[in-house]
Every structure is written in C-alpha cells, then in structure tokens.
Amino acid sequence: MNAWEVYEADLGWGAHPVVIVSHPARAARKALVEILDCSSQRANRPPHDHEVLRDGADGLDWPTFCKCDCIYAVPRTELGRQRGTVTIERRRQIVRTVITTHGWNVL
C-alpha cells in the first residue's frame, strides 16, 4: 500500500473511491492510513473550493470529486480493491487544496 494510491472503502455511506494521503512510510507499514474521500457520482458541475476533479488518469471510471476538507484515519484492512494511482499534477492540486481548505496557508 502506497501514498497516492486509489482504493475503494466504505466510510459508513457505501463504497467510494478514496485516496491514501499518508506519508509513504506510514502508508507502507502502519495499521492506520490517512485518506481523502471521493465522490462515487459522476461530476456534473465545477468543483467547489474544497474539491479536486479526478478522472480516468487517476484510476476512476469517470470524472469525480476528491473532497479535501476532511482527512480520515482508517485501518488499512478497511480498504478494498485498488483502483489506480493519482497523477503527479493532481497530487499537487490535492495538496494545495488540503492546505487551503484547512487554513494552513495563513500560518
């Protein structure tokens, strides 16, 4: 399991794609990994300030949103099928959006 891989997980509202955003060392060997939830619905609007648009290049079947305003810690055993890996440019967008959404850019 590696940072920036896309898996399926059920966080309590049905199976959705999720992105591992843990430090690579944590993603590789710790019991808990940090993830961002992604929409399972096809994106049919522009992304909100807390979202990044992802698509087939990231292992998804259609364009969808990665929600960057809430980081979840879940047991790695809760992650299901691997869907793909987030592209480098999209990783940069996600990191910028997480920082801005949490207000860390003003520190």
Language model: regions and residue ranges:
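C-terminal terminal-subdomain/extension
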Residues: 57-107
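Compact nucleic-acid interaction/catalytic patches
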Residues: 10, 14-54
